[in-house]
Amino acid sequence: MFKTSVFGYIIIIFIIVVCLKIYQESDAFQLKCIVSKVDGNKYCVRERAKLELAADLLATVTQKMKKVVKHMGDTFPDRDNVKRLVKNFRPEKVSETLPTSEFTAYSENKGEKLAFCVNTTKKGNKLIDENTLTFVALHELSHIMTESVGHKDEFWNNFRFLIDEAQKIKVYTPEDYKLRPKEYCGMTINDNPHYDN
């Protein structure tokens, strides 16, 4: 009987440890979710002195992404890549990347979730400017509308297409990052397909 109860306690402790580990690695532990004044939606952001500014930046860029996706769907409704974008974009699933994330931004499963670093450096708290984050968001939207995985020609064509359309509707102002590179979450953006021949 003693062996059975000891074994039971060991199993219970193991389950508790596993649950705590899962919780600590989850968004709920490392991000704080707050409602943005920009659009009234909830955004999960890293703990920092001014949570509202980070949530509002994500909300502003999300509004821009919604405008681009709507424009694409209205203007090019018969294109397969646009159909994918319209179908898979989930504006309610936008958040900040976890502090432990190896990626500066990512699209999970082609649109189920979008996450962005909103800082100029990996460890700092200085927020990135809205136009640069919009460029990164267009990059992630391009992954959603691209059937292939990675950065193949299909992706770059879609990215250039989105940038051009975002410029037309005044959502994004193209910047030549080769001439004026930008720091984004510890990396340097030094190319913009809008300026490629």
Pin down the residues of each PLM region.
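Feature marks short, highly hydrophobic, charge-poor N-terminal signal-anchor/signal peptide-like helices
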Residues: 1-9
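Alpha-helical scaffolds flanking conserved acidic
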Residues: 129-135
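An acidic/histidine-cluster motif and surrounding catalytic segment
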Residues: 44-46
